[in-house]
Every structure is written in structure tokens, then in C-alpha cells.
Amino acid sequence: MSITAKRARRGLLLASLLATVAASAPVMAVVVGGTRSTNVAAQADHSIAELRNEYKRPPVIAFPSGNPYTPQKVLLGKKLYFDTRLSGGNVLACATCHNPGYGWGDGQPKGIGHGMNVLGRRSPTIINAAYLQILMWDGRAGSLEEQALGPIQADVEMHLPLDQLMARLKGIPEYGPLFESAFGQKDIQPSMVAKAIATFERTVVSGRAPFDQWGAGDEKAISEEAKRGFVTFNTKARCAECHGSWRFTDDSFHDIGLPSDDIGRGKFLPDVVKMQHAFKTPGLREIARRAPYMHDGSMPTLEAVVDHYDEGGVARPSRSDLMKPLQLSSQEKADLVAFMKTLTSDVGPVSVPVLPRLNNSSSTRRET
């Protein structure tokens, strides 16, 4: 089914649910049970069940034909991802700003680069990056392979030119066999580094969350508050207009009215009014681990995020037409936060790989 067809189908489901909610004064009763003796309640249950199906997870991870999955590439990519020798000062790795302990971000309002330079935006998570067609807050990268080498070379980020990166990796004997196993040759090339890191990053997928269990039919998997929040998310609050699909994103760009001089996507589309101050819609999976929020890290909590959308943001020509005051009640706000928290899974710790040494005396060591 095409994206357009999916959106059309979803729109019909939302329209049905909105009509049902409007016809039923006690909305909470419609969602969570209680005294319900009308056909309206049954219709609401059916609409919600249909809507839950729209958020079902795909069965497999997406890997491109030009860079298919192999365990050898994942092993190599993970080592490269955690290796600080991919930075000019030998202190920064991909994992520094995209740390599994912080929802594959860094827990800071703004990223920290070479020489403790404070970057202009928050470090985006790599969770579910396998499914992205365009990356970065402003969409400047067209693939994970393209994105992988960008921060390494950037002066303000990892600060290591590609020729120096190649010389450094070739000077670490243990990397040679790893590249040969993954790509069939020891002569390390930048494209091989990019493909290995990208392959590992595609394995970083959000875990099965309470919301998924509820979607599969376990009514006790989430609270009654969260169930109400799901309906509000899809109706009155209009969150699902941009945060749809199983990843809870439309993969598009919107100006949500944050008071910032950063024009985001507008740098690449200067003549498109609605792209000024527009940033990529982030997915909401594992959201409870990923504070602070927004591209500028300006929202410390999910409660602050909900308040921002409820108020409507800064009015300007580029602001999304969807950004209007919502007039949510305190209960509706709490319900929304409760629902969003159900999108976070109970994942375990990620093991840090043993990195290749400068000599090959320990080439048989295994990962912990």
C-alpha cells in the first residue's frame, strides 16, 4: 500500500473515531469501559481496534540492496561506532553523541563536538534509522551511509579528514582482518567504513513496548490513562497528523513554532515559506529515554512538550497550519504523557565491544 493510500485509510479511521467520540459525551467511558450500553461504545471499540492496527511493527529490519546485512559488517560497524580513534583528538566516537545509555542520543540540549565545542542542535537518536529515507534534523543526508562519514570529517564534530582516518585505521593491524571478513579485501576504503557503520546502526531498532503488547490484544499492558491518551493523541491533540505510523513520524519537516533563529530545512529550500524553521519530525519510540526534547533540546520533559503544543508555538508565516492552541485539560495532558511513555520498551544494557589494539597480539579476544 502506498504512503498516500495509507494516509487516506488512516484519515477515514480518524474521522470515524472523531465522529464516535463526538457522539458520546463520556469519552473516558468509551475508551476504558464502565457503563456502556449503546452502539456508540461498540463503534468506538471497533474504530480504536482498527487504529491500533495502523501502528503495528514491521516483521523485519530494512536493509538496502546496495549494502545488505551480514554479521561481519555488523561486528565491524559496532567496533567502529564505539572507537574514539575515528576522531581527530582520539576522544570522540559515534557513541559519544549517540549513546545507548541515553536512548542513542547524549542527554544534552546541544551536542558537544571537537574541543568541547557546543553544537547548534541536539544530537538525534539513531533508533529506527534503518527506516529513514532522509536523515538529520534538516534532511541534509540521504542515507545512513552518507551520514556516517559526515560527522567524522566535520571540523566542529569529530574533526578527522578522511585521508587521516584511512591512515589511522590501516595502522591498526587488527582492523585489517575485520574489513577483509566484511568486504573481502584488506585495503580499507571510506565507503567500507560508511557501510559498516550504517549496517550496525540499522540493527538499532526500538524494542517491543507496552503499546505493542496492547496493540496485540493485551488490554492490561497499558493503563486506562494511557488508553485515553491514545485517543486524544489521534483526535483532539492532532499529534498523529505528524507522528503517525508504527515509528510515530511522517518523516517530513514542519515548523512547530519554537522561538529559534535556526531555519532548519529552509537552508536547502529558501524559497519555500513552510520550510523555514522546519525540522524533521522525530519518531516517538523509546521517547522516555530521550530527554531533553526538540531539535534545540529546549524542552526538558514530555510535560513541557505537551504544554508547547497546547499553546500553539510562535506565530509566523512558516509555522505549520496544524500548530494551533488545543485547549487541552490537565487530565488530557496527563493522559498524553502516559500514552507516550508506553512507547518505551524495557531494553537491557548494550555491550561495548572490545576494540582492536595497535598491535595484533590480542587478535583472538572476543567481545564482552
Task: Tell me the role of every PLM-derived stretch.
Residues 2-368:
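Periplasmic c-type cytochrome electron-transfer domains
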